[in-house]
């Protein structure tokens, strides 16, 4: 390659943020480093666009698709491209989406191309484009490009440390207090660097445009949002923007958790959970703390209640009125429900709660009793609300639920008006179902306050994903044995048949199969110093971390294999694919191509669809194991 080609390639990779570079002061050359995270995020392009389409509408999806294709883009360049597109669309609406550089053609995949042609371009004007960008910036899905964007987290940490040492500790660090101060100043510098990408969002918040829209609009009505275009300030045309993949991962995690809740609790309860997650993660910028930049984070920022809390009224205000909250709620007699246990408040996450309980055991016995009295006094407010609503609560479920059996009898004499008045109580029932689930979807952290502890929820989801893989690989017996080992810990090989209720030959064969797959391990413990094999204990155990790590590596290998097979198919059918790129053939392949060529092209499309579907399934697994 010529130097010009190398420079051009580096520029393109930097524009898509696929490369990091760092230049030391006074140095003549820059050092480059690959950005594997953003390179992998290209696989999630379809999921991100689908998420944007569902949450913000088709115009926002079109803007995000433009940024995905063009990379880091100046606002003026994006506006100029859409101006030309809008003019072409107004002149010839019938050809909108066929010959554009930003991929609007993807919006006609679902068979609604006729509707798109009648409606014209998705972006109606530059003011409409400005509004969409502002909304995406406020949602942190788009952030600002600054000089530190092109540096890796390790280089940023080294730069901040060097600046702090030169400015505040020129004579060196001496003593414990100085070390603590050094860590605090480094953390402050890292937070300052991270906050530079949110400068545009802060300007919009100071302008108050978001608050005005929240008062006027009941959600992100992107398709009908032209009436509020004048409320947003005009963006600086010199501003360079890009997609914030970290925030996209937060929204993708919410969608995955809602899907998980749907499988465990039902659609209505999962919808309530989705609204709770949306409110809770509104100001959450990333799924996981960065190992370098957040390693010396401010301890004062850590909230005892986790990522924050949401009240019942806030959830109720954001629920659609068309959703029937009576669906998915069981019925029981008033005396069969322990309101004290159901309304239990957990102020702290599971790990912190254990430490507090251990500290209380060391004290007097009355301390636990006093705590129980305090909790019961706090729960008395819940009890009063709960009892008041139970007069209508047994009637809050429509006749479609719980009617399969003949032994249970319900009082269905409540009027529809009374059922509508019971909507807050029905919402509380869904939230309590999520809080009482074994998956720890929700934690009841205060009076009418709810939060989500993502660590135990994601641990449960990873365990469910691992169980699914074990069942497909080793069958139900293998999954049963793994769950026994998780519950019992390490078990002797001689005791395992009695616990598992299986014959020893069958058990040994199944354990060997799972050991080969990496789901279980065995440990040899000698009885004496001679370490005789015949006199040793063989303990079987299940190491979750090792199994998940091996499963993640298998996912990487599978994804790479699928992409390699796809590349081989493209080379094999190169002549057919080159024919389909011709302007006189594109869109009319069946009519213009020979039968043999068209059959080869159809087989290639089918194979490509299956391979991409497999890649997406593997990406779902990788997201749960690594990113979420």
From Swiss-Prot:
Pfam families named among the record's database cross-references: POLR3C_WHD (PF22536), RNA_pol_Rpc82 (PF05645)
Disulfide bonds: none
The organism of origin for this protein: Chaetomium globosum (strain ATCC 6205 / CBS 148.51 / DSM 1962 / NBRC 6347 / NRRL 1970) (Soil fungus)
Region Leucine-zipper: start-end pairs: 555-576
GO molecular function, one term: single-stranded DNA binding
GO CC entries: RNA polymerase III complex
Function of the molecule: DNA-dependent RNA polymerase catalyzes the transcription of DNA into RNA using the four ribonucleoside triphosphates as substrates. Specific core component of RNA polymerase III which synthesizes small RNAs, such as 5S rRNA and tRNAs.
Keywords: DNA-directed RNA polymerase, Nucleus, Transcription, Zinc
Bias (Acidic residues) ranges: 360-383
Superkingdom as given in the UniProt entry: Eukaryota
Gene name tied to this protein: RPC82
Location relative to the cell: Nucleus
Subunit structure: Component of the RNA polymerase III (Pol III) complex consisting of 17 subunits.
Region annotated Disordered, chain positions: 360-422
Ranges of biased composition (kind: Low complexity): 390-406
Family as reported in the entry's similarity comment: Belongs to the RNA polymerase beta chain family.
Protein name (Swiss-Prot/TrEMBL): DNA-directed RNA polymerase III subunit RPC3
InterPro entries noted in UniProt: POLR3C_WHD, RNA_pol_III_Rpc82_C, RPC3, WH-like_DNA-bd_sf
Biased composition (Basic and acidic residues): 408-422
Gene Ontology biological process: DNA-templated transcription
């Amino acid at each position: 390659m010529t130097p010009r080609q190398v420079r051009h390639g580096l520029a393109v990779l930097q524009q898509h943020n696929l490369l990091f570079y760092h230049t030391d002061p006074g140095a003549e050359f820059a050092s480059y480093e690959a950005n594997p995270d953003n390179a992998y995020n290209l696989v999630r392009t379809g999921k991100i666009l689908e998420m944007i389409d569902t949450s913000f509408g088709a115009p926002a999806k079109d803007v995000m698709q433009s940024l995905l294709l063009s990379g880091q883009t100046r606002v003026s360049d994006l506006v100029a491209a859409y101006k030309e597109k809008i003019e072409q669309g107004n002149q010839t609406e019938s050809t909108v989406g066929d010959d554009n550089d930003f991929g609007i053609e993807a919006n006609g995949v679902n068979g609604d191309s006729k509707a798109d042609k009648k409606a014209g371009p998705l972006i109606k004007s530059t003011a409409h484009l400005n509004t969409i960008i502002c909304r995406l910036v406020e949602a942190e899905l788009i952030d600002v490009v600054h000089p530190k964007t092109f540096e890796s987290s390790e280089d940023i940490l080294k730069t901040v440390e060097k600046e702090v040492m030169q400015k505040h500790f020129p004579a060196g660090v001496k003593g414990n207090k100085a070390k603590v101060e050094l860590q605090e100043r480094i953390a402050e510098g890292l937070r300052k660097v991270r906050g530079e990408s949110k400068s545009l969002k802060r300007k919009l918040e100071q302008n108050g445009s978001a608050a005005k829209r929240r008062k006027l609009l009941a959600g992100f009505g992107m398709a009908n949002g032209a009436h509020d275009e004048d409320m947003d300030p005009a963006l600086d045309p010199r501003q360079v923007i890009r997609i914030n993949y970290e925030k996209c991962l937060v929204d993708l995690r919410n969608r995955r958790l809602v899907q998980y809740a749907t499988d465990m609790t039902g659609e209505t309860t999962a919808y309530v959970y989705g609204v709770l997650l949306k409110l809770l993660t509104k100001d959450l910028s990333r799924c996981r703390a960065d190992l370098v930049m957040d390693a010396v984070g401010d301890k004062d920022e850590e909230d005892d209640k986790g990522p924050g809390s949401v009240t019942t009224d806030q959830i109720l205000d954001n629920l659609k009125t068309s959703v029937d909250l009576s669906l998915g709620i069981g019925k029981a007699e008033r005396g069969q429900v322990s309101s004290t246990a159901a309304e239990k408040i957990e102020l702290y996450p599971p790990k912190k709660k254990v430490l507090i309980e251990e500290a209380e055991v060391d004290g007097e016995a009355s301390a636990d009793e006093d705590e129980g009295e305090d909790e019961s006094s706090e729960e008395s407010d819940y009890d009063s609300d709960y009892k008041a609503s139970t007069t209508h609560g047994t009637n809050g479920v429509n006749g479609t639920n719980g009617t399969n059996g003949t032994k249970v009898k319900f009082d269905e004499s409540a009027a529809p008006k009374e059922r509508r008045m019971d909507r807050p109580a029905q919402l509380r029932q869904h939230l309590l179902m999520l809080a009482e689930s074994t998956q720890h979807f929700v934690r009841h952290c205060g009076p009418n306050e709810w939060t989500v502890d993502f660590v135990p929820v994601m641990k449960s989801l990873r365990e469910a994903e691992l169980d699914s893989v074990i069942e497909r690989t080793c069958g139900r017996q293998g999954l049963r044995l793994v769950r026994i080992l998780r519950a019992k810990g390490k078990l002797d090989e001689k005791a395992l048949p009695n616990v598992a209720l299986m014959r020893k030959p069958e058990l040994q064969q199944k354990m060997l199969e799972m050991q080969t797959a990496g789901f279980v391990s065995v440990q040899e413990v000698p009885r004496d110093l001679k370490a005789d094999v015949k006199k040793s204990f063989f303990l079987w155990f299940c190491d979750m971390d090792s199994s998940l790590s091996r499963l993640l590596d298998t996912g990487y290998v599978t994804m790479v294999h699928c992409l390699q097979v796809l590349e081989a198919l493209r080379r094999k059918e190169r002549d057919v694919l080159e024919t389909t790129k011709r302007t006189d053939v594109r869109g009319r392949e069946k009519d213009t191509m020979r039968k043999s060529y068209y059959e080869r092209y159809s087989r290639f499309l089918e194979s490509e669809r299956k391979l991409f579907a497999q890649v997406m399934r593997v990406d779902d697994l990788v997201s749960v194991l690594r990113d979420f």
